[in-house]
């Protein structure tokens, strides 16, 4: 009897796996057209935990361009890309789902694939360098995308926070994660001292709550890894230079604009 039950359970598991696999390659698509636009908060959260090298490797194994592979993976795995989800998506599944996305939503698919390709190409380094001194200092990542904020009225946090383990302003260098051009620099009520860098791919990278700046001006070009300033706790005030209303951290965000002159006045902690 126990042996029969085991066979029944095994058969049910096989059927379940086959159904899940088939959902990626045939039948109805697991999303609506709007899901492949920036109106999709899950897409905007950018929960990607793969390095550029890992993404390139998995894309090559599936014989797909980097952007198309990453877009397909995000759709297949509920907008999460990490080693586990990448390894679970087979070459056959990836190609089949990519082809269906192109067939049903070509404009949206290619636009989002271009965005993902741009992000992977842009991001060359982590914005906080590893400490080389005797006193090792590091940071903690806080996935605070979409969390509630109340300063200036109820709103949602649009970005992510890199928190300083040593809660002292002015000691953690902030590096440009990408090459690009300084588009904005100066004080914002919410973001404090901030700087915005626009890459050649048209993506705007926003660094907020700085304690001080490197000698940079609007229009200057920067390279990936170049010093932008130092991490701080500025902001939440119309008075320029206000500090200390929250812990030391870097607010980091990536923005897309249809205008050639990005504005980040709504960016917030």
Regions found by a protein language model. Give the residues of each.
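Surface-exposed, glycine-biased beta-strand/turn segments
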Residues: 45, 49, 83-193, 224
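Cationic-aromatic interfacial patches
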Residues: 2-97
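Short, charged beta-turn/beta-strand-edge "cap" motif at the junction between a beta-strand
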Residues: 188-190, 228-236
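Zn2+-dependent peptidoglycan hydrolase active-site motif and core
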Residues: 175-212, 239-248
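Conserved small/polar residues in nucleotide/adenosyl-binding loops
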Residues: 257-264
């Amino acid at each position: 009897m126990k042996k029969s039950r085991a066979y029944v359970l095994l058969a049910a598991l096989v059927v379940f796996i086959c159904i899940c696999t088939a959902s990626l390659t045939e039948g109805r698509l697991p999303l609506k057209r709007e899901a492949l636009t920036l109106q999709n908060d899950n897409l905007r959260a950018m929960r990607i935990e793969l390095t550029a090298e890992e993404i390139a490797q998995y894309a090559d194994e599936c014989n797909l361009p980097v952007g198309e592979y990453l877009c397909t993976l995000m759709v297949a795995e509920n907008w999460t890309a990490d080693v586990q989800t990448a390894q679970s998506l087979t070459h056959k599944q990836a190609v089949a789902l990519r082809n269906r996305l192109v067939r049903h939503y070509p404009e949206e698919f290619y636009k989002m694939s271009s965005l993902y390709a741009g992000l992977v190409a842009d991001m060359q380094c982590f914005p906080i360098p590893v400490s080389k001194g005797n006193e090792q200092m590091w940071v903690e990542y806080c996935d605070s995308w979409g969390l509630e904020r109340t300063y200036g009225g109820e709103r949602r946090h649009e970005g992510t926070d890199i928190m300083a383990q040593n809660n002292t302003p002015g000691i953690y260098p902030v590096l440009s994660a990408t090459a690009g051009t300084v588009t904005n620099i100066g004080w914002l009520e919410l973001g404090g001292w901030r700087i915005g860098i626009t890459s050649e791919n048209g993506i705007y990278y926003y660094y907020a709550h700085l304690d001080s700046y490197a000698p940079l001006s609007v229009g200057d070009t920067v390279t990936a890894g170049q010093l932008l300033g130092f991490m701080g706790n500025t902001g939440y005030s119309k008075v320029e230079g206000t500090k200390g209303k929250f812990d030391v951290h870097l607010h980091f965000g990536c923005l897309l604009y249809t205008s050639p002159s990005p504005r980040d006045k709504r960016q917030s902690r």
